[in-house]
UniProtKB/Swiss-Prot annotation:
Expressed by the venom gland. This is U13-myrmicitoxin-Mri1a. It is found in: Secreted. Its main location: secreted.
């Protein structure tokens, strides 16, 4: 039961953070000299980084 709660919490955090993560990746891609980062794995990486920032303090 606890595993289900943890998975639901992760899903809710991922859904609520997704628009800001997408906006950040678009802003980074618009910078000169930056390669355009598009893909599921890049979004997962950004979501994991944002999730870890929540628990840093």
């Amino acid at each position: 039961m606890k595993i289900i709660h943890v998975l639901l919490l992760v899903a809710v955090v991922a859904i609520t953070m997704s628009p800001s993560i997408m906006a950040e990746s678009v802003a980074e891609a618009d910078k000169p000299g930056q390669a355009k980062k598009i893909g599921l794995f890049d979004q997962i990486d950004k979501a994991a980084a944002a999730f870890m920032k929540l628990f840093e303090g």
